Amino acid sequence: MIKHNELVIGGVRTSSFPFKIIIKESRSFELSESKTQLLEHDGINGAILQSNSHRPSIKKVFTMQMINPSEDELNQFMALLVREKFWLESERLKTTKWWCYKIEATEAVEEASGLFIAKITFICHPTKFFKDTDTQTLTGNGVLRVQGSALAFPKITVVGQSASETSFTIGDQVIKLEKL
């Protein structure tokens, strides 16, 4: 019903429900803290830095207002929130989406007659992903451009014929093919 600021939770749009769902959130760009640790010891001045560039999961919190849902409709919406391993998209962010592991337990509380409010926390991978697919065509030996710093597992299709060795590079890694 309401498309402004809607969320897409595992392919299901909040606007697809027969009652109004208003998403309250400020547009934000999160970056979780690195797992690097400062180790302090009483016998030395300062600290030892134990580097770890990996990042923990992030929490995306949304407050949702549901207006005049029936009990069955509210149960259908709440059933959506038990999903695990799904994509989360926001209408406000046009180019990125998040891979979510799960949703923390939540409840919908009736604040006024017919107005239910739920605070929902999505536990997501710390890297945002692009919504669009990046298609690149290489001729001869070429370099596959990477976007961002996330681990990526691209689908690579090699077409053609070659009597000699062909190679291409992804980031710093060189992939060699004997014959096509």
Regions found by a protein language model. Name each.
Residues 39-69, 114-127:
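Oligomerization/assembly interface segments of phage tail-like spikes and tubes
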Residues 8, 63-106:
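Short, acidic/charged, Gly/Pro-enriched secondary-structure junctions
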